[in-house]
Amino acid sequence: MNQPLQHITVLLDEAVDALLDGAAQPVAGQWVDATFGRGGHSRRILQRLGPDGALLAFDKDPDAIEEAARITDARFSIRHEGFRHLSELPAGSVQGVLMDLGVSSPQIDNPERGFSFRFEGPLDMRMDTTRGQSVADWLAEADAQQIAEVIRDYGEERFAGPIAKAIVARRESQGPLRNTAELAELVAGAVRTREAGQNPATRTFQALRIFINAELEELEQALEASLRVLAPGGRLVVISFHSLEDRIVKQFIAKHSKEVYDRRAPFAVPTPMRLEALGRIKPSEAEVAANARSRSAVMRVARRTGVPA
């Protein structure tokens, strides 16, 4: 079995510089790392904060909470919750929010988590292993139409129908799927054509992970919450790793970075923009060469205006 890979934080300096607006001096105020992971961004942010700065992190993963316990800095705190709970912070109280979406290398490379088709392990895929339904449990009760919709909508898999039928047929003949190897083998048999350089199970595993963790719904909730909690001039920095995430982030920033006119009342004052889009950044060639998993990353940055949410 391959050894688990060490997590390499993607766009580390670029993200923190964007969050802190390139500040050369230690900064004050309340900051949020909405997806602690293994703490790469949090540790770098803490290095840039002054004595009056504070960093609040969020993460669902018990392993992330365990890693966060190693940070003894009094300016740091973490909540064992998803980042949709940003909504519980006071309005206008935060100077910057950073979101690094997706799964970390330690999660992917730990067979016991069930995120990867490369390792045999339980078919779990929950970000928070202390609560919720596993992929195995859901596949044991969902019908073919439900399974196909999830794989199609969240994996953009054109063979979603045949895959779903194969899962249900396997369940009816041999019992429910229980490990990643069984699912990967079944998907490989149902996918009629292969994409060069991509395992046929890639899209199905992505879809089931996104669905079981309600990742896109939580992202939408967290983005809306960030609009309310960010102070005027505060930064929103989001790193995404696939088109479904990036599309949501891109559309959210675009929606709030333009004046909105009510066509039913053409002479009414338009709703002013609440965000100023500051662009997107991709990893450098050097970063991709050092960390192949950074290849698909896209970072989008926006600044909060003074218009109320």
Curated annotation (Swiss-Prot):
Keywords (A to Z) from UniProt: Cytoplasm, Methyltransferase, rRNA processing, S-adenosyl-L-methionine, Transferase
InterPro entries the UniProt entry points to: RsmH, SAM-dep_MeTrfase_MraW_recog, SAM-dependent_MTases_sf
Cell compartment(s), UniProt: Cytoplasm
A cellular-component GO term for this protein: cytoplasm
Keyword Cytoplasm appears in the UniProt entry: yes
Keyword Acetylation recorded: no
Domain of life: Bacteria
EC number: 2.1.1.199
Single Gene Ontology BP annotation: rRNA base methylation
Pfam families noted in UniProt: Methyltransf_5
Main location: cytoplasm
Binding site for S-adenosyl-L-methionine: G39, G40, H41, D59, F83, D100, Q107
GO terms assigned for molecular function: rRNA (cytosine-N4-)-methyltransferase activity
Catalysed conversion reaction: cytidine(1402) in 16S rRNA + S-adenosyl-L-methionine = N(4)-methylcytidine(1402) in 16S rRNA + S-adenosyl-L-homocysteine + H(+)
PANTHER family cross-referenced by the UniProt entry: 12S RRNA N4-METHYLCYTIDINE METHYLTRANSFERASE, S-ADENOSYL-METHYLTRANSFERASE MRAW
Family: Belongs to the methyltransferase superfamily. RsmH family.
Function: Specifically methylates the N4 position of cytidine in position 1402 (C1402) of 16S rRNA.
Protein name as catalogued: Ribosomal RNA small subunit methyltransferase H
Lineage of the species this protein comes from: Bacteria, Pseudomonadati, Pseudomonadota, Betaproteobacteria, Burkholderiales
